From Swiss-Prot:
Species classification: Bacteria, Bacillati, Cyanobacteriota, Cyanophyceae, Nostocales
UniProt organism field: Nostoc sp. (strain PCC 7120 / SAG 25.82 / UTEX 2576)
Cofactor binding note from Swiss-Prot or TrEMBL: Binds 1 pyridoxal phosphate per subunit.
Cofactor: pyridoxal 5'-phosphate
Residue segments, region Disordered: 1-23
An example molecular function term from Gene Ontology annotations: N2-acetyl-L-ornithine:2-oxoglutarate 5-aminotransferase activity
Pfam families linked: Aminotran_3
Database matches in NCBIfam families: argD, PRK01278.1
Name of the molecule in the record: Acetylornithine aminotransferase
Length: 427
């Protein structure tokens, strides 16, 4: 079945012959589900391509994609086929046994990256936890560091577990969760002098910097691309000192930047990097990749019950193969240029409200002026009313992360809907 057929079916779903189910209730939901999200008053029930529909039947153009996760959009035929095939074949067994789908996916990643080894898990936070553990063991057993320190960046985001909120250089994610995990130190992003100073200052007694964990492009921190010169100097520092260079590619990796991996924009290779979000196209899966020299894990030192299961790996492999077979990276580059051009044209019409457009491929941010009360959430709410889903990246940046299959016509439609939303909130 083609994607266009799926979209048509989602637009005009067949009427159910059974009795109507109870209407969706946000009150019932809120009474049952923990309040870990500040949710918009919108309940989505189906999707196809770059479109989703709410429980009232209203259609939206989805430029959130599960926050940079639905690589191939919703109900893509390749994913539908892979899900159906794998669930009928084998969906879960323990990692005590060899899992062919896991091996195939690992080999695909290795063939399409700088990695030599892969560890599979279920999310970006888990992948970053694995990277932190691997770096710490390497520090103890290879670098002979008694108390290793990992440098991370201010305004970074690495996950919601206790170690990854500590790695995250944003105090708002750490509030109320003391005591935090020791062994992290923050430096300003794209500031090489801050890195050099930290390495010098922290080299005292049993303490030494063992690794640097950083995003090629800061996503939650406001869609801020890394500077090429900065990252190349980071690589040189790590080569000179033995410090591990680790990249968090959870949001920018798997083609979202227009290249398969964000590090390809920067002209350097990490020793360790992580992936999740777009890897499974919306099916939960994460991965931590490393060069052979720093693969120091032994059996029993790290594990995941669900990580690398046949179902997730089988679907993720289909996503990866579809990216390659359909040359989707070229679409990401073309549509990204179109989107940024359109956003800049809109920004020029609102010079007192909109200050900058930035990003790579199909991860882009529209920054609002700091000296006005208008927030990213205000724009997102207005866009929802117009039928466009967007997501904030901090209080002053509106983020655009559509599925990588988005079309030229859909970009144009999104830009028109955004203009309507902006006209409302700036009136």
């Amino acid at each position: 079945m083609s994607l266009q057929t799926l979209i048509e079916q989602a637009t005009n779903p067949p009427e159910s012959g059974s009795a109507a189910s109870s209407p969706f209730s946000t009150d019932s939901f809120d009474a049952s589900v923990m309040s870990t999200y500040g949710r918009f008053p919108l309940a989505l029930e189906r999707g196809a391509g770059c479109r989703v529909w709410d429980t009232q039947g209203k259609e939206y153009l989805d430029f959130v994609a599960g926050i940079a996760t639905c690589t191939l959009g919703h109900a893509h035929p390749a994913m539908v086929e892979a899900v159906t095939r794998q669930i009928q074949k084998l969906h879960h067994v323990s990692n005590l046994y060899y899992i062919p789908e896991q091996g195939e996916l690992a080999q695909w990643i290795i063939q399409h990256s700088c990695a030599d080894r892969v560890f599979f898990c279920n999310s970006g936070a888990e992948a970053n936890e694995a990277a932190i553990k691997l770096a710490r063991k390497y520090a103890h057993t290879v670098l002979d560091i008694e108390k290793p320190i990992i440098l991370t960046a201010n305004a970074s985001f690495h996950g919601r577990t206790l170690a990854t909120i500590t790695a995250t250089g944003q105090a708002k994610y750490q509030k109320y969760f003391d005591p935090l995990v020791p062994g992290f130190h923050y430096v300003n992003y794209n500031d090489i002098s801050a890195v050099e100073a930290a390495i010098s200052e922290l080299d005292e007694g049993d303490y030494r910097v063992a690794a640097i964990l950083i995003e090629p492009l800061q996503g939650e921190g406001g869609v801020r691309p890394g500077d090429v010169e900065y990252f190349q100097k980071l690589r040189q520092i790590c080569d000179d000192t033995g410090i591990l260079l680790m990249f968090d590619e959870v949001q920018v990796g798997m083609g979202r930047s227009g290249k398969l991996w964000g590090y390809e924009y920067l002209g350097v290779e990490p020793d360790i990097f992580t992936s999740a979000k777009g890897l499974g196209g919306g099916i939960p899966i994460g991965a931590m990749m490393s060069k052979k020299f720093c693969d120091v894990f032994q059996p029993g030192e790290h594990a995941s019950t669900f990580g690398g299961n046949p179902f997730a790996c089988g679907v993720a492999l289909a996503v990866c193969q579809t990216l390659e077979r359909e040359n989707i990276l070229q679409n990401v580059q073309d549509r990204g240029e179109q989107l940024r051009s359109g956003l800049r044209a809109i920004a020029a019409k609102y010079p007192h409200h909109l200050t900058e457009v930035r990003g790579w491929g199909l991860i882009n941010g529209l920054e609002l002026a700091a000296d006005i009360p208008l927030t990213a959430a205000d724009v997102v709410k207005a866009a929802i009313n117009e039928g466009l889903l967007l997501v904030p990246a901090g209080p002053k940046v509106v983020r655009f992360v559509p599925p990588l299959i988005v079309t030229e016509a859909e970009i144009n439609t999104a830009l028109k809907l955004l203009e309507k939303a902006l006209a409302t909130v700036t009136a």
